[in-house]
Amino acid sequence: MALWGGRFQGETSALFKLFNDSLPVDYRLFEQDVVGSIAWADAIASVGIITATECRDLKKALNDLLVEVQGDPAIILTSGAEDIHSFVESALIAKVGDLGKKLHTGRSRNDQVATDLKLWCQSEGKALLARLQGLHAELLALAEREFDAVMPGYTHLQRAQPVTFGHWCLAYVEMTERDISRLADALTRANTCPLGSGALAGTAYKMDRHALAAALNFSSPTLNSLDSVSDRDHVVELCSTASISMMHLSRMAEDLIFFNSGEANFISLSDEVTSGSSLMPQKKNPDALELIRGKTGRVYGSLVGILTTMKALPLAYNKDMQEDKEGLFDVVDSWAICLDMAVLVLSGLKVNRPNALLAAQQGYANSTELADYLVSKGMPFREAHHVVGEVVVAAIAKQIPLEDFSLAELKTFAAIIEEDVYPNLTIEACLAKRDVLGGTALPQIQQAIAAKKAR
């Protein structure tokens, strides 16, 4: 039976019921709905709506229902209920009779679902924080293992300056730390309890909402009932935080896909996270990374969806808000599996050091060092930049690296060049010169790793 049937005389259309029912999606809020109902039983007992004995019986029945459904989750979806709240109430009435009909006193599905969803976001958010911290640890371990593996750094996907694989890992460590911070902040803002806000104007029973919030492990109650039942910022923020994190994961995936390609061959991926071709027997495809990259757009879509759903809703609750969950649930599922897969990819990754070093030695990645050398001899940087550009053009024509020019040849470009130029053009010198906070010099990388491990 619907929870709202008394007002209506005609039968609900079967098509409308199919369109309106949310149980196929919101069944995932079952545990939160039971936990919230247990807290609500205590709240209405505190204002004399039910006796202590009735409260005890309601809580026992709710806990029994929790155990039953955990043992057989299919009970929910085969119930025919409109939504998870209807399922819990109907199951409760089946257990304790008319006493079960008292539980909803002073409560609306509006504040009920708002509470359930915040509880769910808190629980899933904490699990996602743990996953992000796992990714952070894996990146840090890889950075420590490969801190001195030389590879080319890129701008515009053109070889730019030599860096190390450890430095690359630390870049994604920084991104992951921002993701962790963002999610923690979002969970802090979502840590308020809407229960007791009623449909929109507040419950008619003068209960202690601070105690109710504490019973559900929220930091405080919400402060405006209109906002409380219509607020979905926590959904938007979780989807937004996920979108930014997925963007970082997608960038990392793209880097690794390129590094793994035959054209680069800087890394090898384990068989655990790759697949083959149904036609070409030689193929080893980076499918885990490609799926991370692909699922990013799906997460973005859910963020745009909830923003669009909420953008023109008047206060307070509107049925449009029923559309808040499907996208959110998919975002959390997609983000979680992508974080798990990223950790698995990194744990089995091997750096092909000779190939990466060779690539770093090519592409005239030491050109900036030659310009800096000229500056050290007194030439203005802009002039030095122009001179080195001419040297590179000549080197390309001769198909040689800069360091293979004779001193006499180099002097034709700038007479101030001396024999001491050559030590400045080695890969080791290129790295060592970047000995500044955040730079790619090996001591800086080691210090950064040590500092992050010490936190």
Swiss-Prot record:
| CDD domains in the cross-refs | Argininosuccinate_lyase
Q: What is its EC number?
A: 4.3.2.1
Q: Under what name is this protein listed? A: Argininosuccinate lyase
Q: Which GO terms describe its cellular component?
A: cytosol
Molecular function terms in GO for this entry?
Answer: argininosuccinate lyase activity
| Annotated compartments | Cytoplasm
- Keywords tagged on the record: Amino-acid biosynthesis, Arginine biosynthesis, Cytoplasm, Lyase
Main localisation, per the record?
Answer: cytoplasm
Query: Which pathway does this chain act in?
Result: Amino-acid biosynthesis; L-arginine biosynthesis; L-arginine from L-ornithine and carbamoyl phosphate: step 3/3
Q: Sorted alphabetically, which HAMAP family does this protein's record hold?
A: Arg_succ_lyase
Which InterPro entries is this protein grouped with?
Arg_succ_lyase_C, Argininosuccinate_lyase, Fumarase/histidase_N, Fumarate_lyase_CS, Fumarate_lyase_fam, Fumarate_lyase_N, L-Aspartase-like
Indicate yes or no for the key word Ribosomal protein: no
Native species = Shewanella sp. (strain W3-18-1)
